[in-house]
Amino acid sequence: MLFLLSPAKKLDYDSPVHVETHTQPLFVDQAAALIKVLKTKSADEIAELMSLSPALAELNAGRYGAWKRSFTQANSRQAVLAFNGDVYEGLQADTLSARQLDWAQDHVVILSGLYGALRPLDLMQPYRLEMGTRLHTPKGKNLYEYWGSGIAEYLNERQAGAKAPVIVNLASEEYFKVVDLKTLKARVVQCVFQDWKNGAWKVISFHAKRARGLMARYAIAHKVARPEGLQGFDSEGYAYDAAASSADKLVFRRKQA
């Protein structure tokens, strides 16, 4: 069973890293080709393409310029420790043990506009390239066309030996869309996190993002091997709602935010 996560815009390359173990990213050729396209753009063009402030556009133009095909601990850090948004505040990877990170390495995949798919301990150079970016490349007019069926094929390879492969989607719609479902062989299980607000159950973006990270942490801590094993998730007041759920859609709700 594999768990899919979105990346984060917010990055942390300053905090001390508590594990030395690292691996090399798998889609370096594809990332290098994207960097080649991005390097042709001025900071103003990047600002327009990605709706960034001039300062952020300059920062990322500099990142593309500094990007190298060789990933070292000097220019990179492990992906799960570099990402620092809402999902990763829920995951709190900096408090996972080396053994837990090893389990995550085998069961968690982080989707990425630049790197395609990252394992938690894959080294990653800093970047900004959201999956929804309309970046024109020789392969098409956006990143979905660029990655094509490649991510789904990779996920198939990862579960080639499984009798009943399962993908648990904890990624956003923007990122999960890069997984070509016609190519994917695995059963997909969605996790939905809802809060009670104004008399109704609603998905509140900030809370849902954090909850996806909390769920990934729960799966890692309990080495969850089947979707049913996720039903015990109870972090920060969430509880599984059997009546609102189905076999492939697990709904978790809470009344206090």
UniProtKB/Swiss-Prot annotation:
GO biological process, one term: response to hydroperoxide
Ranges that cross the membrane: none
GO cellular component, one term: cytosol
Domain of life, per lineage: Bacteria
HAMAP family linked to this entry: UPF0246
Similarity-based family: Belongs to the UPF0246 family.
Protein name stated in the entry: UPF0246 protein BP2452
Provenance organism: Bordetella pertussis (strain Tohama I / ATCC BAA-589 / NCTC 13251)
